[in-house]
A protein has these predicted regions:
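Macromolecular interaction modules
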Residues: 1-147
């Protein structure tokens, strides 16, 4: 049974092209490390959508096109406490001036884990995929709620 219950995604645009280096430095050395002490944060990863990746996207849409980075925090129980602490920490860091200002969140939020898959060639269980090193991801986001 997979202990990961939720993935909190953030799809981010950097609004000033000169700010990518500063954003990466802030995110890797300040913002992301602050999340890991929170109970319920199991893992965090961030991926860049390079120009080549953007050209290879299966879908183009006004909301998706500007996305430069996707961040994912994997969360375990207790979900209510974890999500509250996660949001509270973001607000506290922002109040301290520790939030990158040249960014725009285009989409994001907590999404329940529905199913995981692993190719037979990788020889690991599907449940272990979040812990396996990777060089990239292919993300699909679907609304599975009833109309």
């Amino acid at each position: 049974m997979n202990k990961i219950k939720v993935g909190f995604f953030s799809f981010t645009e950097i609004t000033d092209p000169k700010e990518h280096h500063a954003y990466n430095e802030w995110h890797q050395l300040d913002h992301m490390p602050e999340q890991f002490p929170l109970p319920g944060i199991a893992r965090g990863d961030r991926w860049v959508s390079t120009p080549a990746c953007r050209r290879a996207r299966a879908v183009s849409a006004p909301l998706l096109d500007p996305i430069h980075y996707v961040t994912l925090y994997l969360m375990t129980e207790p979900l209510d406490d974890t999500l509250r602490d996660f949001v509270d920490l973001g607000g506290a860091l922002r109040e301290l001036g520790r939030f990158h200002l040249h960014r725009r969140g285009l989409m994001g939020g907590a999404f329940y884990r529905v199913k995981e898959y692993a190719s037979p060639r990788v020889l690991v269980s599907a449940e272990s995929i979040p812990a396996r090193p990777q060089r990239g991801v292919y993300i699909t986001v679907q609304d599975v709620s009833p109309d």
